[in-house]
Amino acid sequence: MAKIQMKTPLVEMDGDEMTRIIWKMIKDILLTPYIDLKTEYYDLGLEHRNETNDQVTVDSANATKKYGVAVKCATITPNAARMTEYNLKEMWKSPNGTIRAMLDGTVFRTPILVKGITPYIPTWTKPITIARHAYGDIYKNVEMQVKAGSKAELVCTDKDGKETRELIYDFSNEDGIIQGVHNRDESIASFAKACFNYALDMKKDIWFATKDTISKKYDHRFKDIFQEIYDNEYKEKFEAAGIEYFYTLIDDAVARVIRSNSGYIWACKNYDGDVMSDMVATAYGSLAMMTSVLVSPDGVYEYEAAHGTVQRHYYKHLKGEKTSTNSVATLFAWTGALRKRGEMDGLDDLIKFADNLEKATIQTIEEGVMTGDLAALSTLENKQKVDTEEFLLAVNERLQKLM
């Protein structure tokens, strides 16, 4: 069988630990036998980021802007323990944070539903998509540890050199910590438009929530920009489509989501989306059953898994032990990127391949072949727990029948 041809390369961002192992397995077992795979490769593994002073992350984001579609493996965001483990020059920032800031996009995360795995919340019968603002807030922060006797102020200098000062806290008798965060009106507006456009495309209601009663300038600015754009540009379109935009406070939103009937888009600020996407994914069954795509205002797409590097399984792998690691989210990152590349380049065969690979993956699970995390959740009677590679081989068997 002739391999499916590609016109334009995908930007391929390799990653860390167990997901890096899975990344290669997916390519070897499910992609390269069928596709003449064209990628522009960037190694975002922590060791290489350290070697390049994180320049490789910047280069990969610029390549994504150039080519339009990227697929990214999960990566380590270093903490103090990782500094020691990898002998790092410095505590490098999150690659995702860097890429999202450079692309200024919105992250849409949607659970993958399969028969036999019932959400922990029985009323959730349809997917809840989390739309996460991908710029700013604590992910582009500046922070300091301060010593007793210090005074922390927020200072803004305008274009004429005039300073506006606000006292944050007087640390006269104690040590402490401070943090500065920011966002841009333009980025918030892009986020709002991306959410409203996605809601129209999917024909789903959209919710948005902040804490504007406490954060009367910062969070309230998000609320105001969303409302202004909705009223001026989207209200009539939403009414014609029979969908609605709903704003509430973030704590009220959490309560409403838990008791809801699902099936809508929940727009969240950056940190809220980071946290709530994990909560929603886990409530549906597994964080490894969640698609994630970053969409920029100028139509650039970056697909990734919505979970981490699976450190515990990686250490088992290094000892030569078999792991049963769920590869579905990483697999769907590849299918999402290949499908989008096919759509952009007019390659029907590539689109069909991505569709078939997703069908084969879901079919494998629904026929009872799955990794340990799903086996613990599945209500299917004749289920079989398999290891990481065995699952991908089982998917390949079904893919061959669909091709």
Enumerate the predicted regions with their spans:
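N-terminal small/polar loop signature for handling phosphorylated ligands or for N-terminal nucleophile
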Residues: 46-60, 223-264
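N-terminal glycine-rich phosphate/adenylate-binding segment common to multiple enzyme folds
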Residues: 47-159, 163-164, 271, 275
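Glycine-rich phosphate/diphosphate-binding loop of Rossmann-like nucleotide-binding domains
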Residues: 6-25, 154-248
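Flexible, glycine/charged-enriched surface loops at secondary-structure junctions
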Residues: 36-41, 202-210, 234-247, 342-354, ...
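Glycine-rich phosphate/pyrophosphate-binding loop and the adjoining helix
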Residues: 134-135, 140-192, 199, 344-347, ...
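Glycine-rich phosphate/nucleotide-binding loop
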Residues: 257-356, 363-367
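N-terminal alpha-helical transmembrane segments of multi-pass membrane transport
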Residues: 2-8, 18-23, 27-53, 61-64
